[in-house]
Regions:
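Extended, charge-rich helix/loop segments that form flexible
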Residues: 103-189
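Noncatalytic alpha-helical scaffolds and linker/capping helices
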Residues: 70-71
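Membrane-embedded segments
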Residues: 76-80
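N-terminal pre-catalytic segment of deacetylase/amide-hydrolase enzymes
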Residues: 1-65, 85, 95-127
């Protein structure tokens, strides 16, 4: 449930133009983004300068909002900026800085691969499970059950496959194992 009574940031990542295929899961169109801004009430959205001023001076009010864009993705500029401009809104634009330390975030590549080569996330997940040889009993343990309850509470739009995938990626496989499975799937596509 969306809470109207606390100050917070609305964080966004991926966007695509309406009428085009999303390049990754969770991507929004300009129409959906516009609807979200209207739903939360555009008049409640503060500029980054005003947000920082209120934080520094302990003047942030119940219900104040700011908009943030993470990872410096091109779709944010191409799609979301036109909606911000329409309402003369400003946002925090956070760059993806880990490239300065370790290179490309492969998850961005994997996201594009999944949405480009599979008709659904469930079909991808089935192939992922087969390729990774993860036993289905993994999802019967208490660690997974706790993870599932947390994820479904925080992200009620996630499917069972989404949650299972994230558990495997984050906890069941080492990074090198996860990347190996993804690379194998990409090479066999």
């Amino acid at each position: 449930m969306y809470r109207l009574d606390v100050p917070h940031g609305l964080m966004f990542h991926r966007f695509h133009e309406s009428g085009t295929k999303p390049r990754s899961q969770g991507s929004l169109t300009e129409i959906e983004f516009d609807s979200i801004l209207k739903y939360v009430d555009i008049n409640r959205i503060l500029s980054p300068q005003e947000w920082i001023y209120r934080v520094k001076n302990n003047r942030l009010k119940t219900g104040d909002l700011c908009i943030t864009f993470d990872d410096g993705l091109k779709g944010q500029y191409d799609v979301a900026l036109q909606v911000l401009d329409k309402y003369d809104l400003k946002a925090f634009w956070f760059i993806f800085s880990s490239v300065f330390n370790r290179g490309v975030d492969k998850n961005e590549i994997y996201n594009i691969f999944i949405t480009s080569f599979y008709p659904s996330f469930d079909e991808f997940f089935h192939n992922f499970i087969v390729k990774s040889s993860i036993p289905h009993e993994l999802f019967d343990n208490s660690d997974y059950q706790k993870f599932y309850k947390l994820m479904i509470r925080m992200f009620p739009f996630y499917s069972d496959s989404d949650i299972k995938f994230r558990f495997i990626r984050n906890y069941a496989l080492e990074l090198v194992e996860y990347e190996g499975v993804m690379e194998e799937l990409m090479h066999s596509a």
